[in-house]
A protein has these predicted regions:
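N-terminal capping segment at the start of a domain
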Residues: 24-54, 65-74, 201, 205-210, ...
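Conserved PDZ fold ligand-binding element
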Residues: 356-376
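Bacterial Sec-dependent N-terminal signal peptides
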Residues: 1-24
């Protein structure tokens, strides 16, 4: 079956990018890219390893083939070195030197301003670092949502923009080394291939493959320009996303590197899930129609921004500086898209404190000890009051009923 699919996609992708921009073609392109990049052949796309290098080559060759007849398109790579410690959990300048590479596609429309579109293509390899998988066997972490989904969206968006909007130049960057610490985006911003002052704004796609039935979509960085909120809300009138907007320009993804260069930057995100950083983040769980919906939403944002002459930059409050420090956890996955009162739980890790005392997915934490929990920040404040071995009562809301759970932190 896989042979037939591969042959079909081979003939399909012989068409040039601009020949067919229909929704059908674009969604098929997205599916093809996600399926390829999240295949076992790439062994989890770890930075500096054979699978990661192979993934970068695939993206480069894909763009090269598609844009081979377009004189205003340039495809190139940006290599950089990084150090790997013998201990996989520690990055060290004294470790083994390895090569990584960003993959670039630049559409030159001879305009003064450039819009940067970014997505990291690296992932966790076999899970020797950064994995939340607790099994004993080493397994490939394919990272279909994180972040084959973002790469596919960005590449397909370049296809659409080539014909639909020539008001700007466009630079797509598939970043390497994000999982190890934003290596690729940081290197680009320190060694830019275009003048940073010419960048109008940056759009980052990281984990956009799990749009749920409520159409919940998080957009981080809306405070990085005074123009973002009105622009996004106006465009969303015709898109019906349930938006969760966050102002901070700092976050655990590549938009942060651009924000630190005084560039307005957004991060699009469909939410965390139980498969995050686990081998189970596979392509059969991706919402391909959802990625397409986000793509056209972003295309409309870019188009609507045409009427804004001065896209200003604003410094934002760094939410991470206000984050309380804590030494214990419940062993649960927060629902970062939840906009109600409390902290809703999106997943529970087996064997951890929450699981041991009967906390379930879907429960909403509303109080921890003496601390009322209204959001993620107050939840972390509650955790900061305790140490390992401390006993407390956690009040949750389950199916509309308040329940007190007495527990001891492990």
């Amino acid at each position: 079956m896989r042979i037939y699919i591969a042959v079909f996609f081979f003939f399909l992708t012989e068409f040039s990018f601009s020949q067919n921009n229909s929704s059908w073609f674009t969604q098929l392109m997205i599916r093809e890219l996600v399926y390829e990049l999240s295949d076992d052949d790439y062994e989890g796309r770890q930075t500096g390893e054979e699978g990661g290098q192979k993934a970068g080559d695939y993206i480069f060759n894909y763009f090269t083939k598609k844009f081979k007849d377009f004189k205003n398109v340039d495809i190139y790579t940006q290599e950089f070195e990084f150090s790997v410690s013998k201990n996989p959990h520690i990055n060290s300048d004294n470790g083994v030197k390895k090569l990584a590479k960003n993959i670039m596609c630049y559409i030159d429309n001879k305009k003064e301003e450039t819009i940067v579109i970014g997505a990291h293509y690296d992932h966790l390899g076999h899970g020797h670092f950064g994995s939340l998988y607790t099994g004993e066997q080493s397994l490939i972490h394919n990272g279909a949502d994180d972040n084959a989904s973002g790469v596919a969206l960005g590449m397909a968006l370049m296809d659409v923009l080539y014909d639909s909007n020539k008001m700007y130049n466009y630079l797509f960057i598939a970043f390497d080394g994000e999982e190890m610490g934003l290596y690729g985006s940081s290197f680009f911003c320190k060694n830019p291939t275009i003048d940073l002052s010419d960048i109008r704004f940056m759009l980052n796609f990281d984990m956009v493959g799990r749009l749920n039935s409520n159409n919940d979509l998080a957009i981080n960085g809306v405070g990085t320009s005074s123009k973002w909120i009105d622009l996004i809300n106006q465009v969303n009138i015709d898109n019906n996303f349930k938006l969760k907007l966050s102002e901070s320009g700092i976050g655990p993804s590549d938009h942060s590197s651009f924000y630190l260069q005084d560039i307005p930057a957004l991060h699009f995100f469909t939410g965390q899930h139980e498969d995050y950083h686990k081998p189970s983040d596979d392509r059969n769980k991706v919402n391909y129609e959802g990625i397409l919906d986000i793509l056209f939403f972003v295309e409309n944002i870019i188009y609507a921004s045409n009427s804004i002459n001065d896209f200003d930059f604003k410094e934002t409050k760094n939410d991470s500086q206000k984050t309380p420090k804590f030494s214990v956890t419940l062993g649960v996955m927060p629902d970062y898209l939840f906009s109600g009162k409390g902290m809703r739980i999106d997943g529970v890790s087996k064997g951890k404190t929450g699981d041991k005392y009967g906390i379930l997915k879907g429960d909403i934490v509303i109080k921890m000890g003496s601390v009322d929990v209204s959001d993620m920040m107050s939840y972390m404040k509650g955790l900061s009051q305790f140490n390992k071995g401390d006993e407390t009562i956690v009040k949750i809301l389950r199916e509309g009923k308040e329940i007190n759970i007495s527990l001891i932190f492990q």
